[in-house]
């Protein structure tokens, strides 16, 4: 029996001719990632073990992004811990305020992860890099710390679900709608510890930003990882971002999949996930009258330049509804600068939005947009669990940048087409 794309990458990194679903392996790592929340836990363990060196100072990335700019004394201490560790071990890829960004947008932008590589990060949305044809997955802080020391990690080889994408998305339908539709179809545990392997002619109709969004939320279906085949667009993206040499792996024709699901992109509609799980999806048309208090546009899921362009297109010449709060978070400093140069930030501010420096901030209920009891947010983030963005009695509705921007104008969950009819 042949291997899936994910299995081929893992076999190569375990120096094995082949692997099978369920097999336990030890794989070599190309990149190990930590942030200001998960990093200190690993760093303290490394210090406790009295380890003086890391496996490769060029293959570790440290990105303070969750509570930065520092929101309080405790977060400042966390960032100081990561900063001092980076200095002590001469870590090449430490990104300070002013250069940093939300980690899962920053690393591809910096060319630090490419097709065919294996990456672990102590953050569940590390699966984002599957958009580039890499195997990447989230792990706990101690596994990440061990990876920093040894350059290795053990995995159980995942079984796979194949998603055949066909057709072309309608206007205002994006990668966020695709992945919300899929999660709504299979559930938050529908791909538990499996690889979500996206294939099909429809992929050519998805931008890189769409693909990053889809791979990013694979974990919300319980997946070990999500992965896309490498095509001309992938290669162009990697070259544009000065990426290192890459390796292209392709699934065998006789690879085994536990399920094969076909999604016709042309049939999808703008979609929203109701509280308190990403699987609680409805089309916006089905949503009914859902009044909201706040809109968040940004995050590692939807804070890239394509996302901001779509939101600005909707907000151009319009105003945020009276009594509404709209917060925009470009995912990296480079994206922020590009958005300024393209006039997008001017559009947001004229519309009545507030624009923030890159941070994970409100997504995890950290800072910069916390919800009070009884408040509702339409958000382009990736999770809407109870209390995720603030008070346990608040509600989060997950949606695309287009829907979020339209909702900011109307004060309720809305389709952008309503504003252009």
From Swiss-Prot:
Gene3D superfamilies: Aconitase, domain 3 (3.30.499.10)
Residue numbers binding [4Fe-4S] cluster: 300, 360, 363
UniProt-listed Enzyme Commission number(s): 4.2.1.33
GO molecular function, one term: 4 iron, 4 sulfur cluster binding
Keywords: 4Fe-4S, Amino-acid biosynthesis, Branched-chain amino acid biosynthesis, Iron, Iron-sulfur, Leucine biosynthesis, Lyase, Metal-binding
GO biological process, one term: L-leucine biosynthetic process
InterPro entries: Acnase/IPM_dHydase_lsu_aba_1/3, Acoase/IPM_deHydtase_lsu_aba, Aconitase_4Fe-4S_BS, Aconitase_4Fe-4S_dom, HAcnase/IPMdehydase_lsu_prok, Homoacnase/IPMdehydase_lsu, IPM_dehydratase_rel_enz, IPMI_cat
PANTHER family: 3-ISOPROPYLMALATE DEHYDRATASE LARGE SUBUNIT 2, HOMOACONITASE, MITOCHONDRIAL-RELATED
Family classification: Belongs to the aconitase/IPM isomerase family. LeuC type 2 subfamily.
Name of protein: 3-isopropylmalate dehydratase large subunit
Organism: Lachnoclostridium phytofermentans (strain ATCC 700394 / DSM 18823 / ISDg)
